[in-house]
Structure formats: structure tokens, C-alpha cells
Amino acid sequence: MTNELHFPDVIDNSMRKELVKCQKIAHWKFERGLNAEIGNEHLVAGGAFAKGMEVMRKMYYQDGEKQAAALQEGIVAVYKQYGQFVPPSGSLKTAERMAGALAYYAENKPFDGEELVPLQLGDGMLGIEVAFNHELPILHPKTNKRLSYCGRFDMLAEDKQGKVWVVDEKTTGRMGDAWAHQWDLDSQMSGYVWGAQKLLKKEGIDKEVVGAVINGISILKYGYDTMRCPTFRQDWEVLRWYEQMLDDVDGWISAFKHQDHDQILDHGCALYNAPCQYAKLCKARDPEKIVGSYAIKFWNPMLRD
């Protein structure tokens, strides 16, 4: 084995998603830090759009600026966050297109007509770009300290009836009914609602988090589109997600201790005609001979990098 085994102190949805897909992915990616893909256009583009929205919302709601001025600063933030990343040839998620998506969203969803506004938090700040990190009742397999689960979403908002919603923007391709309904059982949104509920309780805010609102922004070849998808989460659904997440992490710890990880070994190894980045390792009789072809970069859930 060419690099030391690592087990994360903090778990997030990206980790759990890979873990339940295939424990071996969790081994290669999070225990070993192996990466063939440095720089993901979807993460870079989505992060740039999110930064633009954050800046625009803070200037409008927190600083009292007009939306036109807030939009201009948001566009600057998109380019800055996108940085020097070079997307694949033919990609629709260039820096220019993401800046255009922000302008399109601002025009079609003006803040002065918005039904969901940032919640006032206990520290006097507004619920824009909200992060949480809550302890779990599970001990780290090496340090024996408690693990935690973290998340970060775009806004914690209140509607006109006083109900609280997690709000998250998603950039994507074409949207339709299937895209809208995928969020009803989505683990990321369930985790965000759980995290928001605990956050409000910790801050002494007596309000109910009823679910999540996903604002979809499609980046099309000849334009853009938007779709708003509310998805409710009842208390029993959040509890079910939480207990399942704990079971998944417990299973990962057991696999880590014994270094015996379940593998999918089926079509999931090449979903949508895109082979898993670790497929060649699983195909090799002695994968340790070729792990050197991968870069070492451990996922940091707190920084989303």
C-alpha cells in the first residue's frame, strides 16, 4: 500500500453518496485520496454561480443595494470564483455562460417579488450561504473522537406564512418532471433539513423547517431556463434519513477496520456510459501496482474541495 489509510473526521452527503453507491469508491477516494479527475466542470461552474448568488443576495438583503448593482457585483464574483479553470471543449458551463445564467435568473426571479426571503439568524446575520457541522453518536475508528456531519446550502429562508425552507440552487441541463421529482427522496436535501433544524434549535429560534426549495437553472445551448421545486420533509422522513445515514457510516467504519469493502461489480461501474474513475483499479488483479497513476487529493467537506 503506497499511502497511509485515512478516515474522515467529518462526513457529508458527497461522501455518503459515493459510499452507498460502492464501498470501494469510498476506500479509493476518501481513505486513500486517489483522484484521476482534478477539476470538475460541474462543481466549478455550480460553485461560481452559487458565489454570484451569495454576493447578489447579501448586497440586496443585507446591504440594501438595488438589485441591478447587486447583480453587477454578483457577475464579478462568478468570474472570480470560476478562476482559471479550463472546461472541456464544447462545454456549456463556461464562465461567460454562468455569468449569463446569473443575469437571466435575476431578470426572471427579481428579489422585490420573491416569496422566500433570508431568515434573520440569532447572530444578527441573514441566512445566506448557511453552513452547519453537527456531532454524530459515532466514534472515529482511529482517534476515538466523535464524528460529525456537515453541509452548506445557499439560503435559509422564510415564507409569508412564517415557515422556514432550505433553499439551494442547482445548475443543470434540461429540466422536466423527472428532474423535479428526484428531490423528493434526495439525501442531500434531507440532510440539509436535518442540519437546519438543529441549527435553529441551537440558536433558540422557534420556527419549523418544513422542507427544501430547489431553484433549478438550466444552461442550454441557446439560452437558459428556470424551475422551482419545493419538496417537503416530515419529521419521520428526516429521522429515517438520519438513522440510515448512521447505519451507512457504521458500515463504512466496519469495512475500514477490516479493509474489506463491498463492490458493486455491475452496470453501476459505468453509469451513463461514463466508467468509474477507479474501474481500472477494480479490473486489476493487483491494483497497488497502478495506484501511482492517480493524484493524491483528499476531499475536504468543510471547504467542498
Question: Which residues make up each language-model segment?
Answer:
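RecB-family 4Fe-4S metal-dependent nuclease core
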Residues: 1-305
